[in-house]
């Protein structure tokens, strides 16, 4: 069965020292790249591949004080799906009791702000090229119901080839029809009049204003609204009057004035900008591929399956959102993201993935080669293009020397084994399942069907995969076999977890427990003791109930 790796609650990792440096997960943290509202951004180096990443450290206490803990969970899940050449990728999220570590794409060119400060204004052609890339990223976010709300040259990074990459979605949030944002955030010099005045705003229009300020900075090397005295700065912004140098093209001046309209209702939308004559010059086709037509009658099974895996939800939940045209629901957003990403890869031949350096264009090799950061323990996975049957066959390997993938029905975690089992017991108790402890790392669980009064049963076995990774395996069980192997044990229904103390197991211990090679599915129905119950066979239903038990448990653990 497919291994489920996005067990967010249990995907915690402790800080470790590595040659005097802090290590989080597989990443050795290095120098500080910058300091933001919630914490620092450090460069990280993957201990296995040697590739660099940027690690954004979000302090939990600061997040709690802003009351955004509940809001960012599904937003981060969708940001993992974002794949655009001009948006910084989010690879993985690692949690510790004190911090959240967001492992992101690293680019070497620094901030656009520093580049302008050092080199001054850019020529019109280069300004247009970068602005086209920035607006393409903003449009991608808006189409998938995310607003940035803090766009500025400091949040636009440059790669080694002088391509723009939008970063720092820390202040962004999902937008929905009829919902107005009240939060006043962002940097004053780039903030729209409705933001600094505290008025209600919908979201996309504030990104248009900020994009206009960035375009002005590219063309002029200065800001349209600037003053050391904050009240004076606010007055300039609310008046919307800015200086236009004589060297500016009249066409771009008209675009700037449309984007920097004080009245958000009169302000340019992305559609207006895309149709502007200045913007359309030398516009690469890949930046704005044709809009997808999302059909409520034609469902993409591959995308549907991927959403269910990433959000640990049922197909019915996703289909309900799609059929009801609830496009603002995170499940629907994720579904359309996956389709959008595939369409971009298929239609845009010069579209390259947002990796560093971005000189690898799409070809057959790059479509099948995994990203260097996509190692087995990463939480985030890139939405994949369609594969051949050979690629989907785990028995075949396209390249010699590549270790064959191992499939499990279970969850991997790098937490301590005692903590894993303690969390499992809490989840079982919350679901009102019954269980008994065979040993500290092996539980037998059953659930009573309220309709048939029969029991569905499974075992939970924790295995050690390597020196730091554990696999919680789900298995449908047959009591006659299990009791003969393990003997009887007193059923424990208490929520107490005092039994789980330091009792680490090695790989040899796992083998001694009779590690299964496959997930065993059985259609027999037996009682928790060794005596079978005479119940008429229910072909297929036992398997379905087993998977329902697994799904319910995983949902609780993922909260």
UniProtKB/Swiss-Prot annotation:
Tagged with keyword Protein transport: no
Record-linked InterPro entries: AMPK_C, AMPKA1_C, KA1/Ssp2_C, Kinase-like_dom_sf, PRKAA1/2_AID, PRKAA1_UBA, Prot_kinase_dom, Protein_kinase_ATP_BS
Compositional bias per record (Polar residues), positions renumbered to this chain: 485-505
Necessary cofactors: Mg(2+)
Organism of provenance: Mus musculus (Mouse)
The EC number(s) this enzyme carries: 2.7.11.1, 2.7.11.31, 2.7.11.26
Predominant location: cytoplasm
Any one GO biological process: cellular response to hydrogen peroxide
The encoding gene: Prkaa1
Protein biosynthesis found in the keyword field: no
Annotated ranges, domain Protein kinase: 27-279
PROSITE patterns (UniProt xref): PROTEIN_KINASE_ATP, PROTEIN_KINASE_DOM, PROTEIN_KINASE_ST
Entry keywords, A to Z: ATP-binding, Autophagy, Biological rhythms, Cholesterol biosynthesis, Cholesterol metabolism, Chromatin regulator, Cytoplasm, Fatty acid biosynthesis, Fatty acid metabolism, Glycoprotein, Kinase, Lipid biosynthesis, Lipid metabolism, Magnesium, Metal-binding, Nucleotide-binding, Nucleus, Phosphoprotein, Serine/threonine-protein kinase, Steroid biosynthesis, Steroid metabolism, Sterol biosynthesis, Sterol metabolism, Transcription, Transcription regulation, Transferase, Ubl conjugation, Wnt signaling pathway
PTM section of the record: Phosphorylated at Thr-183 by STK11/LKB1 in complex with STE20-related adapter-alpha (STRADA) pseudo kinase and CAB39. Also phosphorylated at Thr-183 by CAMKK2; triggered by a rise in intracellular calcium ions, without detectable changes in the AMP/ATP ratio. CAMKK1 can also phosphorylate Thr-183, but at a much lower level. Dephosphorylated by protein phosphatase 2A and 2C (PP2A and PP2C). Phosphorylated by ULK1 and ULK2; leading to negatively regulate AMPK activity and suggesting the existence of a regulatory feedback loop between ULK1, ULK2 and AMPK. Dephosphorylated by PPM1A and PPM1B.
Residues annotated as catalytic: 150 (proton acceptor)
Gene3D superfamilies: DNA helicase RuvA subunit, C-terminal domain, Kinase associated domain 1, KA1, Phosphorylase Kinase, domain 1, Transferase(Phosphotransferase) domain 1
Region feature (AIS): 302-381
Protein name: 5'-AMP-activated protein kinase catalytic subunit alpha-1
Catalytic reactions of this protein: L-seryl-[protein] + ATP = O-phospho-L-seryl-[protein] + ADP + H(+); L-threonyl-[protein] + ATP = O-phospho-L-threonyl-[protein] + ADP + H(+); L-seryl-[acetyl-CoA carboxylase] + ATP = O-phospho-L-seryl-[acetyl-CoA carboxylase] + ADP + H(+); L-seryl-[3-hydroxy-3-methylglutaryl-coenzyme A reductase] + ATP = O-phospho-L-seryl-[3-hydroxy-3-methylglutaryl-coenzyme A reductase] + ADP + H(+)
Subunit and interaction comment: AMPK is a heterotrimer of an alpha catalytic subunit (PRKAA1 or PRKAA2), a beta (PRKAB1 or PRKAB2) and a gamma non-catalytic subunits (PRKAG1, PRKAG2 or PRKAG3). Interacts with FNIP1 and FNIP2.
Family: Belongs to the protein kinase superfamily. CAMK Ser/Thr protein kinase family. SNF1 subfamily.
Phosphoserine modifications at: 356, 360, 397, 467, 486, 496, 508, 524, 527
Notes on activation and inhibition: Activated by phosphorylation on Thr-183. Binding of AMP to non-catalytic gamma subunit (PRKAG1, PRKAG2 or PRKAG3) results in allosteric activation, inducing phosphorylation on Thr-183. AMP-binding to gamma subunit also sustains activity by preventing dephosphorylation of Thr-183. ADP also stimulates Thr-183 phosphorylation, without stimulating already phosphorylated AMPK. ATP promotes dephosphorylation of Thr-183, rendering the enzyme inactive. Under physiological conditions AMPK mainly exists in its inactive form in complex with ATP, which is much more abundant than AMP.
Binding site for ATP: 33-41, 56
